[in-house]
Structure formats: C-alpha cells, structure tokens
Amino acid sequence: MIKSFKDKNLEKCWRTNQCNKFRTDLVRRVLMKLDLMDAATCLDDLKNPPSNRLHPLHGPEYKNCWAISVNGPWRLIFCFENEGIFDVRLEQYH
C-alpha cells in the first residue's frame, strides 16, 4: 500500500486524476502502475507483470529503495518497508 509520495504532483495525479504536469503518453501507464503498487502487500506482488522489471537501487541515498519500469527511461522509484511503500516519485533514467 502506498503510504507517501515524494513528488506532490504525482500524488495529486493519482488521487484526483489532474495530471497536467505529466506527459500525456505516460499518464495511463503511471496510474496503472500506481494502482498495482497500492494493492501490493509485499515486493513479490510487484514482480508481475514482468514488464515492471522490479529492481533494487544502489547507493546510500537509495537505502531500501526499488524501481519499476513505466515506459522507456521512465521509472517509478519508491522505498519499501514492512508497513508499505513510501516516497514514491517518477524519474527519468539517463
């Protein structure tokens, strides 16, 4: 379950469907992935579909953080702890 967002525009998009801050070609997939994340009770729940490409992030600033693919270089980044998913944000790799 999603507990918090690091990106307030992303939170607004998910909660209200007011997504004018994001590229229109990404919105549908981002919202679908956020719904999957909110329904997840453990990390294994995010391994399917395989196109999520769930993977851990490395580095001191990414302790307990993971990413799933959205589209091309876009990823949803989040931290996972027993209580749920925290600090969700959308980032473009590269």
Model feature map: region roles:
Residues 1-33:
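Arg/Lys-rich, positively charged N-terminal/basic patches that mediate binding to nucleic acids
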Residues 5-9, 17, 41, 49-52, ...:
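Residue-level signal for pocket-adjacent positions within structured domains
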Residues 15, 19, 35, 39-42, ...:
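Generic surface-pattern signal
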Residues 25-51:
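Short, solvent-exposed, low-complexity loop/linker segments
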Residues 42-66:
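A short, surface-exposed loop/turn module that caps and links secondary-structure elements
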Residues 57-61, 66-94:
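Enriched for short, Lys/Arg-rich terminal
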